[in-house]
A protein has these predicted regions:
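Active-site helix of classical SDR
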Residues: 154, 190
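Active-site loop immediately N-terminal to the catalytic Tyr-X3-Lys motif
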Residues: 132, 179-185
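SDR active-site lid
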Residues: 207-273
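Residue(s) in the substrate-gating loop at a strand-loop-helix junction
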Residues: 174
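The beta1-alpha1 cofactor-binding region of Rossmann-like NAD(H)/NADP(H)-dependent oxidoreductases
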Residues: 95-105, 136
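Conserved glycine-rich cofactor-binding loop
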Residues: 53-54
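Substrate-binding pocket helix/loop in short-chain dehydrogenase/reductase
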Residues: 130-131, 135-140
Length: 307
């Protein structure tokens, strides 16, 4: 049986594509391969990650790379990285989020590598201890890294996302950004700041087709000791000891790999959900606070500490 597959080109000339089923099959296969390669190219997405040398940042870089994403993993000293540098689809760049000039420089280098779809603001650490024992330098350093670093990296990428009317910012917040705990006032302050900032910014960014989300984990196993600074004072030794005991022996501690999976879900679920509370400990405490109210929650924390 004969077949005639034709179309008119832009000059309205009749173009014959195939006259037999064999010709049609050949033409269709060529077309499929062409568009399939284009589809694959377009579906290869890129994530830019800060604080990728350890913990959640590193686990997220590995998780996304294993999912076929291109990953731009940034850290203060990429020359010391011995694992991510072995992955073909991971590029390492230097970035200290407390250095505004380097933020601009690294952003430009990252954008020169190609299209970026997601920026994951993850760099941060915990400053724990009573306020009386914390120095002004420690306060400034905590705010510079946990809050201002996120703000500056976001500012650097907004024009790019705005121009293409697409893109997503994801920030590592904390359950300490929706609930406050003792002996962590400055850490709480940075995470609460991120929560208000993110919610307000979500209205602005939605006007230009850009999204923003926050990940709110509870205790994360790899970061309890590795990314925490302690400031102690003898007058508060009892409270500090009780609280640290709760942290060290707490149930429902989450791994960095589990958080990385939540980040991936946030990046790919196609929703405009703002907050992702994750980890059994965080989910339980947050549900308790919502159900019982602020004052009842505060009382429960005091009761746990025997205060």
């Amino acid at each position: 049986m004969a077949l005639c597959l034709t179309y008119f080109n832009k000059d309205y000339r009749l173009i014959i594509l195939a006259t037999t089923y064999s010709d049609f099959a050949t033409w269709y296969l060529q077309l499929y391969r062409r568009f399939d390669s284009i589809k694959i190219y377009k579906m290869t997405k890129t994530i830019f990650i800060t604080g990728a040398s350890a913990g959640i940042g590193k686990a997220t870089a590995i998780f996304f790379a294993n999912k076929g994403w291109k990953v731009i993993a940034t850290m203060r000293k990429p020359e010391n990285e011995k694992e991510l540098n072995l992955l073909d689809n991971v590029t390492l760049l230097p970035l200290d989020v407390t250095n505004p000039a380097q933020i601009k420089e690294t952003t430009q280098k990252a954008l020169a590598l190609g299209d970026i779809d997601v920026v994951f603001n993850n760099a941060g650490y915990a400053l724990l201890g009573v306020l009386e024992a914390i120095t002004d330098e420690q306060v400034v350093a905590q705010m510079e890294t946990n809050f201002l670093g996120v703000v500056r990296v976001t500012q650097a990428f907004i024009p790019y996302f705005r121009e293409k009317r697409a893109g997503l910012f994801i920030t590592t917040g904390s359950s300490a950004g929706v609930m406050a705990f003792p002996v962590s006032s400055m850490y709480n302050a940075t995470k609460w700041a991120l929560e208000g900032w993110s919610e307000s910014l979500s209205y602005e960014l939605s006007e230009v087709g850009v999204g923003i989300k926050t990940i709110e984990p509870g205790l994360v196993a790899t970061e309890i000791a590795d990314r925490t600074i302690f400031a102690t004072h003898p007058a508060y030794e009892s409270l500090t000891s009780k609280f640290m005991a709760l942290i060290e022996h707490g149930e429902g501690v989450t791994t960095a790999e589990q958080i990385a999976e939540v980040v991936y879900g946030a990046a790919t679920d196609g929703t405009d959900t703002l907050r992702y509370v994750c980890g059994e400990d965080a989910k339980g405490l947050y549900a308790q606070r919502l159900a019982n109210g602020d004052e009842a929650f505060r009382k429960s924390i005091k009761d746990m500490l025997g205060a």
